[in-house]
Structure formats: C-alpha cells, structure tokens
Amino acid sequence: MGRRRIRSRIRKSHFYTFKCLRPKTLEDQGPHIINGPGYTRIVHCNQPHLHLAKVLRYTSNYVSTTRYNLITFLPKCLYEQFHRVANFYFLVAAILSVFPLSPFNKWSMIAPLIFVVGLSMGKEALEDWRRFMQDVKVNSRKATVHRGDGDFGRRKWKKLRVGDVVKVEKDQFFPADLLLLSSSYEDGICYVETMNLDGETNLKVKRCLDVTLPLERDDTFQSFSGTIKCEDPNPNLYTFVGNLEYDGQVYPLDPSQILLRDSKLRNTSYVYGVVVFTGHDTKVMQNSTKSPSKRSRIEKRMDYIIYTLFALLVLVSFISSLGFAVMTKMHMGDWWYLRPDKPERLTNPRNPFHAWVVHLITAVLLYGYLIPISLYVSIELVKVLQATFINQDLQMYDSESGTPAQARTSNLNEELGQVDTILSDKTGTLTCNQMDFLKCSIAGTSYGVRASEVELAAAKQMAIDLDEEQGEEVTHLPRTRGRMHGYAKMPSKTSSDIELETVITATDEGDQTQSTGIKGFSFEDQRLMGGNWLNEPNSDDILMFLRILAVCHTAIPEVDEDTGKCTYEAESPDEVAFLVAAGEFGFEFTKRTQSSVFISERHSGQPVEREYKVLNVLDFTSKRKRMSVIVRDEKGQILLLCKGADSIIFERLSKNGKNYLEATSKHLNGYGEAGLRTLALSYRKLDETEYSIWNSEFHKAKTSVGADRDEMLEKVSDMMEKELILVGATAVEDKLQKGVPQCIDKLAQAGLKIWVLTGDKMETAINIGYACSLLRQGMKQIYIALRNEEGSSQDPEAAARENILMQIINASQMIKLEKDPHAAFALIIDGKTLTYALEDDIKYQFLALAVDCASVICCRVSPKQKALVTRLAKEGTGKTTLAIGDGANDVGMIQEADIGVGISGVEGMQAVMASDFSIAQFRFLERLLVVHGHWCYKRIAQMICYFFYKNITFGLTLFYFEAFTGFSGQAIYNDSYLLLFNVILTSLPVIALGVFEQDVSSEVCLQFPALYQQGPKNLFFDWYRIIGWMANGVYASVVIFSLNIGIFHVQSFCSGGQTADMDAMGTAMFTCIIWAVNVQIALTMSHFTWIQHVLIWGSIVTWYIFLALFGMLPPKVSGNIFHMLSETLAPAPIFWLTSLLVIAATTLPYLAYISFQRSLNPLDHHIIQEIKHFRIDVQDECMWTRERSKAREKTKIGVTARVDAKIRQLRGRLQRKHSILSVMSGLSGVSASTDTTSTTQHS
C-alpha cells in the first residue's frame, strides 16, 4: 500500500525520476506522440477500467482539505504545540514533576499544561472538523455518469474515475476537470462561470471539437472511445496542451475545450465531457497551495523575551543550587533534625557537587512560573476577538456591494499598526475598474468633448486659479512631468477648446459632470452620434473603426427577453465598454456562435444584420499586449482586426498604414495625460493564398504538444500581425474610487509612504497621481529612464546599467543638496528601467533614492516586478510593508509583503484569496490602519508586557522564599494556588486588556492620524519599555515578599496570639499578588467597559470565593488550607491591611512614572486624553486645531500638503509684494527729496 502511495505521488510530478514509472507510448498510436517530461498523461475515454493498470494508476476524485486525519491528528497537532519553546519547557517540567525531586504536586504542573495545550488542540480539531464536513459535503455530490451501453446513472463525485463520460446540467458544478465533447447548443459551445477558481464573474465561452459534435445524446456514447494525450497535472488555470486521437485522426486540444472542476455551467442546458484530471490532480486543487507563513514583528520579538526569561530562570536556578550546595557543606552539621550522622545523597556535606546538580533540577521546576504558560493561547484568543471586531465594523462595510471587511488571518492584527510603506496597485484599487468609453481618435481626428474625472480633479489639486485664467489668452491644464502647457484659443472652436471649456465650467460647478445614463458610455460628441459620422470626411475609416469595436473581442451577449436589450459578459471591463459604445454608435453585437458573430448595423435606415465568420482568434496575453481576430465578411473578404497597446501596434504598421500615426500619437498622449486607458485599433486585408499558407502553419503550432507550444503560437501570430493599417485609438475612463484622495491624505498625515505600482503608461499614472494628491504642483519629479547612448563602444546592457546608476546617484545627490525644508520629491520609473534598477549591484541605491522621495510611481511594471519591488522595500528597509491590490497580477506582491490586503473588486477574488485582510474599497484602508491597526498594536504590546510583569512578580517570590529558607527547594504556595494563577485568576483581565483597550476613540484616531506613528516607532514594545515592565515586576515581588515576611514572621498576627505558619503566610502573600497584578492592569487601561470591570474585580472576588470553598472541603482534600480564610486570615485585621499596604507600595512607582511623563514629557495620546477629558477642545478650539496641525508638519503628499504648499506660496507672494512696495516707497521718498533739492538750487 505504501509503495502505491509513493508511486501515486510521483505520478503527479511533471518530471519522472524513475523511467519504469513513465507511461508507455506506442509508436503506432499516431503521428503526434507526446514526448518529453511533463506531457505524459494518457486518458482512455469511456474506458476508465484501463487506468487501473499500475503504470496509469491515477488519483481518485476524493478531495481532502483537512490538515489532519484520525491517525495523524495526535502526533501532528502535538508537534505543532510543542515546537513552541515555552510549551516544550512545561512538557519537560510536567514529566519531571512525577519524580520525587519536584517541589510541587505533579498535577499542579500537568493540569495547566493539559488545559492550555488541550484548548489549542481543541481549536485545531474544531477548525479541521469543519473542513472535513465541507469535504464530505463536496465529495458526496452526485454526478450523472455513463455506465455503459448508452445508459447514464447517478454516482458520487468521489467515485468518479479518469476516463468516465459525465453529463453536467445547467447551474451544476463540474465534478472534475473535463474535456468538453458536446453541448445542448448545435455548435457545441457552452458558458462557464469560474468564480470559484479565479473569482471572475464574467462568463467564459468553451467550444468542443467539431468531430465530437454528434455525441449529443446518451445513446451516442454506447460505442464511443478515444485517447487523450496531454500535459501532466499543473496549477496553471489558463493553459492546456494535448491531443485527442479519435477515429484514426489526431485533433489538437487547447484551454477552450477544458471544463475545470468547481466552475459552474451557465446559460447551457447540458454538456457531455470526459474526465481528464481527478481529485488533487485537478487544477483547482493544484492551486490550493498554502499562503506563505507570516509572523508579526511583535511575535518575533516575543520569542527573544521568552529566551530572556529562560536565561533568568537558569540564572536564579543556578544561584539557588549553588546556595543549596554551600549551605549543605557549611551548615549541615547544625541541622540535627536532618540526621547529619546518617546523611542522604542529597544532603551529604562531603559531596556538595552532587547536591548542587540534583537541586538544579528542583530549582528549574520551582521557578518555572517565570515563564507564562498561558501566553500563547491568550494571545490567540485575543487576536481572534480582535479580528471579529474588524469583520463587524460597519464603518468598513460597503453597502453597494454588500461586502464587509474581513480579517482572513488573525496573526497580523498588531502588524497593521506598524506599517511604514504602502505599495498599491492603481487599476481597481485607486480606480474603480468600471470603464466608460469617453473619447476616441479616428483617422487623425479626436472625438469626445467631455472632460475626464482625472482632468477635473488634477486641475483642482494643482490649485489652478480658473477665475484668473479664464480671462487670459492661454488656459493651462496639468501636463506630463509637472509642466504647464498651453493651448492657444482659435477663432473656431476645436475639440480641445470645447474640452477646456468643459473643464472650467465643471470645475466652477463643483466638479460634477453630467452622466449619459448609460453604464460604460460617457461619450459626448454629436459628430459621431445618431449616424452623423456619415457626414464626416473620413466616413470609411470611421466605419472600419466601429466594426473593429463590434467584432474584435471574445465577449458573450445576453439578450433580456423582456426589454430586448443586450448585456455582455467579457473577459475585461474594457471590452464591455467598447461593445456598449459600438451599440450606441449603431453597431450592436447581438449573437455569437462557434464560427460567427452577428452585428446589427443601423447607421443608415433600417437595421441590417451582418454575419462575420470567425476564422481564428489570436488571444490577448500580457506578453503580447494585443488581440486579433481573423474574420470573413459577407463579401468574402478576409480581414485581420487587431487592437492593442499603442507601442505594440505602431511598430507593426505598414508604410501606407501610418497616415494617421502622428495625429493619433498626439491624441494618445493627451488621453494618457487625462488619466484615460488607451488602445490602438488597426486592420489588415488578406488574400486567400496568404491566409491558407499562414493557417496551415498556425494549425501545426496549435496541434503541437510540448513546452514550446505557446512560443510557437506567438511566433506564428507575429507572422500575421504585421503590415497593419492604423485606424484610430480608444480612450476609456477608469474613475477614481470614492474617497481615495481623502484616504491618501490621512495615510500621509499618519506618516505612511505610498508607492504606486501600475501596468499603465506613464502619462496615465502621473495624472492619477495628481488626481489623488500623490503628486502636486511644485513637487520636484525625478524621472529614471533608459537613454540611448549614441556612439558608445561598450556593451549596450552595461551602458544602460551604468547610465541608470548614474541617474540614481545624481538624483540622490540633488536631494541631499536641497536646502528648502519643504521641498518634496517624487520618483517616477518605468518597467524597462526598473529591470536594471532591481539588479543586485543597483537595487540598494535605487531603494535609498525611493525612500528619500515623498512618493514613488512605477509604471508599465509586470506582476513579477511588483513582487520584486515589494521584496526590496521589505528587506531593504527592514520596516513593515503593506501591499494592496485587486487583481490576479497583484497576488505576487500581496504574498510578498508583510501584510497583504485584497480588494474585492471587478477583476475577481484571486487577490482576496491570497490576502491577509480584505476590504471592498481603498478608502477603508484608512480605518483599517489608523484605527484598528493602532488599537491592535497597542493592545497586544501592553498585553505581552503585562504578562511578563505578572509572572516575574509571582515567580520571584518563590525564589526569595527559597533563599529565606536556606535554599531548601520548598514552595511557599499551595499546589492549588499554582494551578489557578495563570489559567484563571490572572488570564481574563489580560484578555480584556487585549480586546477592549482604547487609548483614544476611533473618531480621535481619524482626527489625529499622527498618533499612528507610535506603532512604526514601536514606542510600546521597545526594549526600554519591556525591561521597564520586567523591572516593575522585580520591584513588586520584592515589596510583596518583604512586607509579608516583615509582618507575619515570628510574631502573632491575630487576637488569639497565634503566629503565621507557612501556609498562612503563603496564602496572605498570594492574596497580595492577586491584588497587586489586577490593580496594576486596571491602572494601565485608559478605557473601561462593564466587561473589564467584571473580569478584573471578578478575578479578585473569585480568589476569595475559591479560598473559602476550598477551605470547607475535608482536610484530606484541602490539607493545611482547611478553614484558612474563615478561621485564620479573615478575622485578622492585619491580613486586610497588608493587602492595602501592598497595593499602595507596588503601584507607587508606576503612578510616579506616569505622572512624571504626563507632566514633563507627555506622549501625543496623553495630551489628547486630557483635552477630551476636560473638554478643552470645546473651550479652546485654537489649541485643539494646533494639536491636530502637528500631523501635517512632515507631510509632503496629500490634500493637506497641497494646501500647506499653497499657503506658503501665497505668503511668499505677500512678502515679496510688501518688499516691492517698501522699495517703491523708499524710491519715491528719495525721488521727492531729490526734486525738492533741485528746486531749491534752481531758485
């Protein structure tokens, strides 16, 4: 059985180490034999029994997502618990406690360990049980499977086998990865929703092979058989390489024929498919890898504190053992009751070394309470509750989408309060990813007069005085690189003039543009609307442009039966906007079949339906940056229609296809500067011979099976996508999300650096930067770009690298030499340049420059570059980084950052699934960090410090008493006290601290974002504060022990004249500890709820109740504690007075310190607390404003920085004006004096 499992695992690999395990292939199986590692899977269609052979033994369709099973739970979970240092120590201590050397009863060590570890294991078991029940539910789903002779029956998913023919009906999930054989549609297409795989809600079209179309009924599968040879299991959702051998022919397979497990059949009655991958071989399971393990900085430092406490434990144990050895050697003769004449090995004065070694074990067990056993479980519980509060925060709930914030992991709550740098995607993160068709350029003419939202916002953020400039001859708009370019007014209004007037008017009216009321279409220009384009001089080019919009895509139309209107499911929001625009212009895409698209053209008279035969589709990829379709129109003309990035299209134009290149380039630059997303549109006419030759090459490439198939397809596509004719370009608007500028302003005031990493062109990114206040007028912009060094004799790569390094060095030097303290720099770099800047010999200089800049914008970057920049910022600065994005291309940087935040947007849920926290909109990041991050950081930091304080206070009293009793190894406390201390009596108040503490309210956090800097500066968990709390614990332990020994030792303490025995003294001392540590935590808190009062004071009351009840038990159970409270301690006033004295003495240093700090060196939150408590913000608004203004002193980005810069500019102008007036006044005075003198002389 074991060998089968090993071979099964090896079978999943892309590369086979053992030749004997590779599937055999026969040379007579056809011309397309799959060779090479990674392409060895053979599937016998409709013959699943053939896969039972050893060499083809595939995994079952049973899927398990659990971490444990009945056999592995105990060992694996115990390992998870005891690889923690503290838990391992207590395990060793519990084992040693069963031997006579232990100073405690064994259950006082074993019971707390069982409780803490059992609680953690119970939590793991509960979570895994939920996963198991979900697995059972999924595996028990029923599928319709061919049982032979054309008969189909129901079978559980887990019993499906490779090769089974499955029938899936509408709105059902696919039970495994299937090869589509046929569907209810006559042309063999079906619609699939992949939300469970990649989160995308857009429907995808799948198409079966023409040869399997006849398999459309159950009885047609009676004699069906075929062989699939394809790639091995892999996690790539978007690729599939294979062949189908059927009826003696070989047919190529691609991703359009594969139906993936957990995707859903939509808008299709039924499909038939054959199982290719099952269970953990399916692509969805191959993608279910664990996210990288992340630990917060506080948790990492906590490990070092644990090690410090271990060092303290070893130190006091060593001292105790050494003292015991000395006492044994020097004083054993005086202790007659120990029978020194018959010494035991432990008390033999002739062998003190042996006594030292044996006592060392006793001491290590005795002082083990220095290590907080309940620390880990308490922190886990607190973090879960904190995450619940984040999830339930209504201020981060998006009512439009019904999406709340979600803490997908609770391990990083406190890390939210220590973020230094935010790395953000642009599209869908800062912007909405809801595209509106706004402008276009056709045949060298720009159409569309409506101003973009970015133009309006950028104009506003750059503080353009429109009132002054409307009367001038030149009107300014924000342009590339922060310069102000002008447009001269022309006698006849051009589109640019109309556009400028729109900007001015809209800005005056509050930046509110009117909407067309059509989602995806904000275009406004009567020259193209209502068929008016027929009157334009280049109407033929406009016709081709609009047909490209309507035909060149892979979208799916859905017609509403009630209204008759079409909606579209497309792979990107851009395509939907194009189709909506085409429909508004009179070219409505109405129907798609496997081989054709149908367009209803109504530009002249009655609507005419035209059919375009789709011959080939050259899909869009991030590498190609373009897509093309080859169609045959109704006249038989073959056309290649292509759209893509302008840089890609322009280099593929023919000589006679560049007629509009210059004008279109100019328009594209303007669109980019207006923050619009642009694409160039082109076409090419093909003749039959040329197409036939190319199509045969394309078929060969598509039929090939191997690692180089994509490369071959790209090469063949390049052969066709050339000699293009440029028609025009599109410009769609991706609007800023609600509240983005305000959020960025708050984050900037909180001291956070913001870097934008986007795949858009530089002009678009820059203007988005202006719109959201990452850039502003007067900010010095540094551009790092590749420059051609003409005449250079050295290697081009080396020359480029050297040139970029020099640019970085010069820019860094310029920043250092800058004397203006208010100067702000922005770094802008593109993807090509970034490739060199991220190399090992340059990247740290680049990082140093980026850190010195107020904002960083990286344009045209790939997903891999996003991850590399994030890693550089994280590892290079050593500070906490947060990455935020919404698409699959952001997954790398989200997983690479210390904290990953996913936005549940239009692009799907892949970013969310890879993230640590998810929110619906970027603006919620403000509250997530400034409020919850600040609170969680401070709560966890104070909680951990207090944990160490209380355990040092308790543990060192054991050491003092042992020293007081001659290092005898005797514990002063009853074993039951030890059992309760960490687990019950002091754990609940500290949990209340970690869950409910607030230094200031959420409103004040947002009003005073500079408070957030306490986290990145680590003010509450630096070594000074940690050592301070430990020192406070040492002081409290000394005070408690000294006062109790001084009061209760060798003197009567009650009216009956009795002296206190060890148990009475231990009980009194333990009572003082309970009071001291609980009063200390009450003084630590700034915010109280009734829950905190109940838990703090209830813990003290619980101690007295326990003492009373335990003392009522028979002496056989309670031992020396029998009636301890009721008869011994409670009647003695000194017992109660000692508790009050200890409370006053132990809290005195903390009160003195906090009073000194608040009076002479207050922290920001101290000032805010006093202002709010005494309502000074209401009585003295100027002081409140002044305190809030501290947040903006170092802010160089955001709306606030822009306003401050404007104020400084106006003050400078005013000072210069006064200076000029003073000089003019002085000159006029001198002139008047001169005139008087000359007049006198003349007289």
UniProtKB/Swiss-Prot annotation:
Null mutant phenotype: Ala6 and ala7 double mutants are hypersensitive to temperature stress and are impaired in pollen fitness with an altered lipid composition and short and slow pollen tubes.
GO MF annotation, one: ATPase-coupled intramembrane lipid transporter activity
Subcellular location: Cell membrane; Endomembrane system
Cellular component GO terms held in the UniProt record: endomembrane system; plasma membrane
Keyword Cell membrane tagged: yes
Gene3D superfamilies xref list: Calcium-transporting ATPase, cytoplasmic domain N, Calcium-transporting ATPase, cytoplasmic transduction domain A, HAD superfamily/HAD-like
Transmembrane segments: 75-96, 101-123, 306-327, 360-377, 942-961, 976-995, 1026-1048, 1062-1084, 1091-1111, 1129-1153
Record function comment: Involved in transport of phospholipids and in regulation of pollen plasma membrane lipid asymmetry.
Protein name stated in the entry: Probable phospholipid-transporting ATPase 7
Species of provenance: Arabidopsis thaliana (Mouse-ear cress)
Higher taxonomy: Eukaryota, Viridiplantae, Streptophyta, Embryophyta, Tracheophyta
Gene assigned in the entry: ALA7
